Amino acid sequence: MRKLWKRAAALVVSAALAGAMLPSAFSKEATDAVEAKLTTMTLQEKVGQLFWVRPETLDFSLNPEKKTLTQTMRQNLEQYPVGGIAVFKKNIQDENQLSSLIADFQSASKIPMIVAVDEEGGAVARLANHEAFSLPKYTSARDIGKTGDPEQARQMGRTVGGYLRFYGFNLDFAPVADVD
């Protein structure tokens, strides 16, 4: 019986590896598009893609609560391009301002930016816990995980992902694997 399990496991691993080696229908097209874009980028732009910053760091006045993309920030973004921004509660005033901030950053960047937020649920929810937003609030992902109900996790993911996408975010720093 043990020998049978080993063979079955080897077969599953072999099939998975073989499947991973098959080219996808999009891989050549996507690779070509990326390669074409890279040939037009300067070294500074390529290195800038490695960095994600808070919006206010692009305004050297050190005002920690920037809620709009200023002309200075726009100029600094052009001179010091970055790959993305991480938005925090202090950068958020209301729904219209948030959508405008994200759209303005995207339009000011030559390359589509990663726009991230920390929307884990529970105490860490920059939008759901903000007084200007009427969004569903979830307990922490840890609490949902403790229920053992995958449908609750799926529902949280769909809901949070949906409203983040609506506002222009394309990365959520969640779920996380926090341990006590």
Regions found by a protein language model. Give the residues of each.
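Bacterial N-terminal signal peptides that target proteins for export
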Residues: M1-V12
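Bacterial N-terminal signal peptides
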Residues: V12-A20, D118
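Sec-dependent signal peptide cleavage junction
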Residues: G19-A36
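N-terminal glycine-rich anion-binding loop in soluble enzyme alpha/beta folds
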Residues: T31, E35, Q44-K66
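Residues within well-ordered alpha-helices
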Residues: V34, T72-M73, V160
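Enzymes and membrane/adaptor proteins characterized by extended Gly/Ser/Thr/Asp/Glu-rich
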Residues: E56-K66, N76-D180
